[in-house]
């Protein structure tokens, strides 16, 4: 039963990606460029969540309602984080995403057409160029989503944060909006085939202003953002059924 359920879930993801991804490539070029892409992306995310039996509840959306040109910082537990964030976060969204995703047929093509920002973590020069592109998106009133851990956790616990997102916020003066996701680790784990239906809680925190700060404040600002997400995540986990809110042992995460 678990195998068939997982197989069905992957089938839903593939079909939805094709059904929404192909027309979204063309929609991304309709003036104003990239603006017609987001409804397709949100539709794709919501169809995948509904088709795989994932229920999402978000709180705190009003805290980010007026934060145009903000940087969303979110923890990264699962592939499903992308669907969840597209479904619930307000604003004109763009992801900072790892470069390899842009090579995925249909998905990568649509991301490139829509103006998502590729990041090559192994190339510092390219990473700096990506921050410049993301800064331009922010100045245009878009909201950039960043996973500051830069990878999905293998244990369900929060990983150390990298500084790139903080540098972007400092460069543009855009506030950081912390976002905590709880429950996706129980639905799908990094590198795993198994997919389970379940409930996800998302909690959006108060924007963290960066006005008056400089690059010298990057370590303190990174720590503050991480602490905010840690606290929000604990609150979100507390609203989940115990089996979904708890993190499995590291050995279970590798299965």
At which residue positions do the language-model features occur?
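Non-catalytic C-terminal accessory region of glycerolipid acyltransferases
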Residues: 128-255
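Membrane-embedded segments
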Residues: 79-129, 133
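Short, hinge-like loop/turn segments at secondary-structure boundaries
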Residues: 75-76, 112-114, 194-197
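A transmembrane-helix-recognition feature enriched in membrane-embedded lipid enzymes
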Residues: 1-57, 109-114
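Short, flexible loop segments at the rims of nucleotide/cofactor-binding pockets, characterized by
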Residues: 48-51, 72-73, 121-125, 154-156
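Conserved H-X4-D acyltransferase segment
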Residues: 5-12, 41-97
């Amino acid at each position: 039963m678990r195998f068939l359920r997982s197989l069905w879930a992957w089938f839903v993801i593939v079909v939805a990606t094709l059904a929404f991804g192909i027309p979204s490539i063309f929609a991304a070029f309709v003036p104003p460029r990239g603006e017609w892409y987001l409804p397709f992306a949100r539709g794709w995310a919501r169809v995948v969540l509904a088709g795989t039996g994932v229920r999402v509840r978000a709180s705190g959306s009003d805290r980010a309602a007026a934060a145009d040109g903000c940087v969303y910082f979110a923890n990264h537990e699962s592939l499903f984080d992308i669907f969840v964030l597209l479904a619930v976060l307000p604003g004109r969204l763009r992801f900072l995403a790892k470069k390899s995703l842009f090579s995925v047929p249909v998905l990568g093509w649509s991301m490139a057409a829509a103006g998502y920002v590729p990041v090559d973590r192994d190339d510092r020069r390219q990473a700096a160029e990506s921050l410049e592109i993301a800064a331009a998106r922010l100045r245009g009133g878009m909201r950039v989503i960043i996973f500051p851990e830069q990878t999905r956790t293998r244990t369900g616990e929060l990983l150390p944060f990298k500084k790139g997102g903080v540098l972007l916020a400092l460069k543009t003066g855009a506030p950081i909006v912390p976002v905590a996701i709880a429950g996706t680790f129980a639905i799908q784990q990094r590198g795993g085939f198994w997919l389970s239906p379940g409930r996800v809680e998302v909690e959006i925190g108060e924007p963290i202003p960066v006005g008056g700060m400089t690059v010298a404040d990057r370590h303190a600002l990174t720590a503050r953002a991480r602490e905010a997400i840690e606290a929000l995540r604990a609150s979100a986990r507390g609203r989940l059924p115990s089996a979904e809110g708890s993190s499995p042992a590291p050995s279970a995460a590798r299965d």
